[in-house]
């Protein structure tokens, strides 16, 4: 199977987000890459499901709380910018203060 670099990046996000979800379910606190992957994955899937940019900007800030991540991780992520594919094209979704 041949994948473009963009497709490989999306696949890596899915794998990292799945690992993060499993660790969270086991009660483990997430580190920086896991937290970013989980939020990114949920926003990408929301775009695929037809949600708007505004909806995803709000939704992205509800996925994880400070209790879900290791100490200091929330402060390391002031915002996340995700290039998501919507039915009408690719758009940039910025989630401000994603972990509250």
Swiss-Prot record:
Keywords: Cytoplasm, Hydrolase
CC per GO annotation: cytoplasm
Reactions accelerated catalytically: urea + 2 H2O + H(+) = hydrogencarbonate + 2 NH4(+)
Gene3D superfamilies: Urease, gamma-like subunit
UniProt pathway annotation: Nitrogen metabolism; urea degradation; CO(2) and NH(3) from urea (urease route): step 1/1
Enzyme class: hydrolase
Annotated localization: Cytoplasm
Enzyme Commission number(s) from the entry: 3.5.1.5
Recorded family membership: Belongs to the urease gamma subunit family.
Subunit-structure text: Heterotrimer of UreA (gamma), UreB (beta) and UreC (alpha) subunits. Three heterotrimers associate to form the active enzyme.
PANTHER family noted in UniProt: UREASE (PTHR33569:SF1)
Name of the protein this chain belongs to: Urease subunit gamma
Organism for this UniProt entry: Bacillus sp. (strain TB-90)
Name of the gene: ureA
């Amino acid at each position: 199977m041949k994948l473009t670099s963009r497709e490989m990046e999306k696949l890596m996000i899915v794998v990292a987000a799945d690992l993060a979800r499993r660790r969270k379910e086991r009660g483990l606190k997430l580190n920086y890459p896991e937290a970013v992957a989980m939020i990114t994955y949920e926003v990408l899937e929301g775009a695929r499901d037809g949600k708007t940019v505004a909806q995803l900007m709000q939704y992205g800030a509800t996925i994880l709380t400070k209790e879900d991540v290791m100490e200091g991780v929330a402060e390391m992520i002031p915002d996340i910018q995700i290039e998501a594919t919507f039915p009408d094209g690719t758009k940039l979704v910025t989630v401000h203060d994603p972990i509250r």
